[in-house]
């Protein structure tokens, strides 16, 4: 990729007198501190930009955007666009020629007497950088002969200038930015752009003896024309522009941070989170006992006839079925390796995680430019479980595990000593940079964290967006998202995948056919074409028998307790899930006050990682035990119980819960469903899946759960969602993509696409206690708090 950077001195000769940053002892005077020139900072940013583009193969994405967005633009027009794009980096800090910035921030009076902005702008520089960018490129755009190309390139010039203006803050609304250039009489939005424009006019007249050739301000009719061009009527095109702007903003912020840290702290970034060589990882993976068994089966047995598999005993056939699905998925992937969206739908307990791990490695091995893997899970417990599994798979080999990082709110930032052997300030600065920009080849994280990267408008949300380029994304349990967002999610995922060259594997035991919600006719690939034959195999369909007898009576905790006491006599492992934490705690207290001949345990979302691990260890050792839990038990908790009780909610949740029962297929499992708490009161996000007609309160839903025919269930759900999105209200999907996504209303998109509606006011309360981790290791809360205070 040939990057042509503009010489800043040809744009503004005064840059040679300007500084960008200062460092040194804060006790020294401004004049005594070492300073980095504006040209030095700009060149360092350009160098980091070239490195990231090269290492992350970003040119592939840039070329794809040009193909998708400028389908009919001439080579001359494309070249001009590329110059505008790359020189966003060059221009981002040129506004530091502001004399007030130089004097206040740098102690530099070389520009004294030069045109100064008024107090509204003061010592700010980003907005001045944006108007200087516009002044430079609007003049040159006007020389483009083709009218349509001229208009399109002018639109992009404004968009690029907006990214420059916002590179020290959040991505706000593009419309508000344009309105800010209006005259002081315009009451719409702020007028910072107008003040910057007045400074530019004065600067050019007084310092350069020139006039501003092209006015920055666009009148309303011109703005409307621009928004019609950039948004159009195609949702895919709207996503392409939205994704491109986030990518360029992410790159701009990244190179600015890297260059600044390089100068201020001496931290030179050499790796940018890509998998340079996966052969050692695949080699270690294929040497595991499970993989060797699969490969031997592939040579000698695969594929087996379905009739033969049905006749085998349950305990004997389950591994054969898992292997068949593993190889089906692998072969289908190879046949459709050039596609972008893949669905992996397997029964609960079929080994989806291992299948997805193999698929991600196969993609890296076979697809040029793919160089990163994300594993995204709905809960932190699943993240914990899978990083533990990866440690077992790779035998905790340091060279492999160093490439894998957990990114969530619970796990500390990954520390990897390289050139910074001692834990100095430099060491921690690099740790922070790696975390902020996800500079890890393999990342395990949660839906919430990933969605912030995809859609969040705060600067910190967009930091790592460029890391999505040329990556494999494994999405676990997508049905756990709010169903009101499914249409928007699949539209975004398809657009992002095509633009950013992502391979997205969506996996679940209960997977909605999201293709029905999008107008994009490029179908996703079902990795297991004959999935029904697996779902209906007795080993999965009959592993756990659902019992609905308790639904026939008005349930109380006393009635439930009496029923559970009878099951205790069978000396089995019993799991009881409530959808209300209050009910779970009350029932646990009731059981502990009752004389029963087994130990009773409790787990909720408040249980720490350590507490959960201790509970899981106990469950594996005890033959007779009761575990009372909340929904936290549905996923990410590796347990195998004999008998289950569950308060009914979503059908997806019922299936997930049943996956905790009789996982080994060594006996017969049973789950008793009861109706105690209102699911509608628990799920307050309007999810129609908790409507009575879609729960096991209805016999047709009971039949679906028994036969695992979830396609019928989701067919009804999706039909309702499709009709809702066509309604003339705030849920209208066409309006959302055209008016908000297509017109770059970042805060509105962020608000709509967040996963959790948090309505509580939270306050952290730290309680001191002593944890006994082992016979030789204890953690004292008081000591931890004192260490924290000393930081």
Give residue spans per PLM region:
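Conserved helicase ATPase motor motifs in RecA-like P-loop NTPase domains
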Residues: 344-350, 477-517
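Conserved Walker A/P-loop ATP-binding site and its immediately adjacent core
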Residues: 371-394, 408-411
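Inter-Walker segment of RecA-like/P-loop motor cores
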Residues: 397-455
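Interdomain hinge/linker at the junction between the two RecA-like core domains of SF2 helicases
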Residues: 510-567
């Amino acid at each position: 990729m040939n990057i042509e950077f503009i010489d800043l001195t040809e744009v503004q000769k005064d840059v040679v007198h300007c500084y960008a940053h200062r460092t040194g002892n804060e006790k020294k005077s401004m004049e005594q501190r070492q300073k980095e020139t504006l040209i030095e900072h700009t060149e360092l940013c350009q160098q980091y930009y070239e490195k990231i583009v090269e290492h992350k193969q970003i040119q592939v994405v840039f070329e794809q955007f040009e193909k998708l967005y400028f389908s009919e633009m001439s080579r001359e027009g494309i070249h001009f666009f590329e110059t505008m794009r790359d020189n966003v980096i060059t221009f981002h800090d040129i506004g530091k020629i502001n004399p007030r910035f130089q004097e206040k921030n740098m102690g530099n009076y070389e520009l004294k007497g030069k045109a100064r902005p008024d107090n509204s702008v003061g010592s700010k520089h980003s907005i001045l950088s944006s108007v200087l960018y516009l002044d430079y490129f609007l003049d040159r755009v006007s020389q483009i002969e083709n009218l349509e190309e001229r208009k399109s390139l002018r639109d992009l010039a404004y968009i690029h200038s907006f990214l420059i203006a916002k590179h020290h803050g959040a991505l706000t609304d593009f419309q508000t930015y344009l309105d800010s250039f209006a005259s002081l009489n315009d009451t719409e939005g702020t007028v910072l752009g107008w003040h910057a424009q007045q400074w530019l006019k004065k600067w050019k007249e007084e310092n350069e003896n020139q006039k501003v050739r092209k006015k920055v301000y666009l009148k309303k009719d011109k703005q409307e024309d621009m928004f019609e061009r950039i948004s159009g009527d195609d949702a895919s095109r709207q996503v392409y522009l939205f994704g491109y702007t986030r990518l360029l903003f992410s790159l701009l912020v990244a190179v600015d941070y890297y260059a600044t840290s390089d100068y201020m702290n001496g931290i030179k970034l050499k790796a940018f989170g890509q998998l340079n060589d996966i052969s050692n990882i695949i080699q270690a993976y294929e040497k595991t006992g499970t993989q060797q068994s699969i490969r031997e089966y592939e040579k000698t047995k695969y594929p087996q006839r379905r009739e033969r598999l049905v006749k085998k005993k349950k305990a004997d056939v389950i591994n054969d079925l898992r292997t068949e699905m593993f190889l089906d998925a692998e072969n289908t992937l190879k046949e459709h390796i050039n596609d972008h969206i893949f669905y992996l739908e397997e029964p609960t307990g079929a080994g989806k995680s291992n299948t997805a791990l193999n698929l991600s490695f196969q993609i890296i091995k076979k697809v040029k430019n793919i160089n990163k893997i994300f594993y995204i899970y709905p809960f932190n417990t699943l993240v914990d479980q899978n990083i533990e599994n990866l440690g077992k798979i790779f035998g905790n080999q340091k060279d492999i595990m160093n490439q894998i990082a957990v990114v969530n709110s619970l796990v500390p930032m990954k520390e990897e000593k390289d050139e910074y052997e001692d834990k100095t300030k430099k060491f921690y600065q690099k740790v922070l940079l790696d975390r902020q920009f996800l500079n890890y080849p393999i990342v395990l994280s949660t839906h919430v964290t990933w969605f912030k990267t995809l859609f969040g408008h705060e600067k910190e949300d967009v930091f790592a967006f460029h890391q999505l380029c040329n990556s494999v994304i494994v999405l676990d349990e997508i049905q756990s998202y709010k169903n009101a967002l499914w249409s928007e999610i699949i539209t975004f995922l398809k657009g992002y995948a095509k633009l950013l060259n992502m391979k997205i594997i969506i996996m679940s035991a209960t997977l909605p056919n999201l293709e029905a919600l999008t107008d994009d006719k490029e179908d996703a690939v079902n990795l297991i074409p004959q999935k029904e034959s697996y779902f209906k195999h007795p080993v999965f369909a009959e592993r756990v028998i659902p019992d609905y007898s308790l639904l026939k009576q008005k349930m109380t905790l006393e009635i439930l307790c009496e029923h559970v006491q009878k099951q205790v006599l069978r000396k089995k492992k019993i799991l009881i899930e409530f959808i209300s934490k209050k009910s779970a705690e009350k029932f646990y207290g009731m059981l502990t006050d009752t004389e029963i001949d087994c130990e009773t345990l409790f787990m909720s979302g408040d249980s720490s990682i350590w507490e959960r691990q201790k509970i899981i260890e106990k469950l594996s050792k005890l033959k007779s035990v009761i575990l009372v839990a909340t929904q936290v038990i549905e996923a990410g908790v590796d347990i195998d119980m004999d008998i289950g009780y569950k308060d009914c909610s979503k059908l997806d949740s019922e299936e997930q819960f049943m996956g905790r029962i009789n996982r080994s297929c060594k006996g017969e499992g049973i789950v008793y469903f009861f109706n105690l708490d209102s699911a509608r009161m628990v799920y307050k996000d309007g999810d129609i899946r908790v409507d009575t007609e879609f729960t096991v309160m209805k016999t047709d839903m009971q039949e679906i759960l028994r036969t695992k025919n979830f396609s019928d269930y989701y067919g009804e759900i999706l039909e309702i969602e499709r009709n809702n999105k066509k309604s003339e209200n705030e849920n209208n999907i066409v309006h959302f993509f055209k008016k908000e996504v297509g017109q770059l209303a970042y805060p509105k998109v962020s608000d709509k696409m967040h996963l959790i509606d948090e309505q509580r006011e939270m306050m952290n309360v730290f309680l001191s206690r002593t944890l006994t981790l082992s016979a030789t290791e204890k953690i004292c809360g008081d000591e931890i708090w004192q260490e924290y205070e000393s930081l």
